[in-house]
């Protein structure tokens, strides 16, 4: 095997499967090395190179971990960007330009004599795949930084002006992103029956996400110009919503995907549910990786729990709001699951939950607030206490969806509602279909809502007046919970402050310093104590004296668990500038030293 391919294969793991690795540093390649010309002359070798780019989709636990430290999922440690004191001086990250270089390098080779032995069809397909990855990477960076320099070629080592050009308007960058994704949509011929590789539908999905994000980010954050004050001229908000709707509609009309009947199977099956999953990560029980074991993951680095404020947004099974029910605010943990959206009990532990044949209440030592996640967890692997000596050898074998059809339906519904084009037919096709799959009944499946839900409006979206948009946002929260979109959704909806202000509240408990039977089965389960002398033998004893951040608060005659962190560690700036990362001051200084300008984002 030639030297170049050895370099590639030593870094690109798992071949044509989802690699989830850092790809090779193509800047190391020397065109004069023996065998260099062979790398891009073989379709197999080129595909190996492209497979190294799949790490850009994240690890199999990326979605789960990305939703930590949001409004509905507390954490001990938050992103530096959302801590008080974050500034251009403390910022250290500025783009992922090594990845952009790699994409451009491969594109350069595919358009050169190095790829002369490839057929025109092979070359076109490979170029389309690489442009998909470049478009996705730039879209990710637009979300993080806004304006960016655009590079569509390999920079010469002596091209100092090119290397140090200032950022261009995000409006211009989005035009380039959509050009890349449109090329991928029109030219990718590769298919992926097991949903582990990019395809035309993956490109459409990325276009849908990018346009929906950009439209709502501009609308709800009142962003109309670049950091330098240049007005956007390529796309209006309406243009972007329309593009998002069109991309989603193409996937819908393609007829390749539909909703699976068993929602939980999406997250527990060994093989990806390709009826609904557009792109996913295939895993295996005998390969130790970051997904193994999801139950271990949910028990480490407490607190790992949903909040009660968010759990309250799950509807009743008949499609009516739980928060319209008299006395909902003081419901016990046992009672609040009664007649609820079935997805609630499939997302968190519920009264009567069992593993290994034994009833199990939430593990409050890890899930402080009582809503312990089980969405991705194989229940038979739930015992991570060490009591089972063989447990250490058990690993999750369930694969993980990355992009799925339900999100397409929700994006289509949102874009149509924002455009003022929502009707009963679209509602039934999208939100209604998702709720029906979940087991919800009633008119909310077929009729566009007309009554604003005051709980959603008060606790989450005070500036939204459309009942339909509120319900679509409810449905995104419930359906896509712990799938890695929450932070992005809040920021694009102009609700970033919820990352700081949303209460991290938990279940209601009857009393402290006494043993409690949470699930009503006649056996005491836990004692929440403020006085260590009040611990009770034979139950889980959980301190609520603030020593771990966990306390109790009065809630209409009951006690409610609350998790608190230092306010400086959970911060949102009043001027809203945290919608974007800072450009590190050291980068700006380095440009200035060489006589160039690198524009900072507003507020820093």
Residues of each region from the PLM?
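Bacterial Sec-dependent N-terminal signal peptides
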Residues: 2-8, 13, 18-44, 177, ...
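Conserved, well-structured interaction surfaces
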Residues: 43, 47-48, 76-145, 159-197, ...
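Long, intrinsically disordered, low-complexity segments
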Residues: 23-26, 96-99, 176, 253, ...
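Short coil/turn linking the two alpha-helices of tandem helical-hairpin repeats
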Residues: 142-144, 149, 192, 213-222, ...
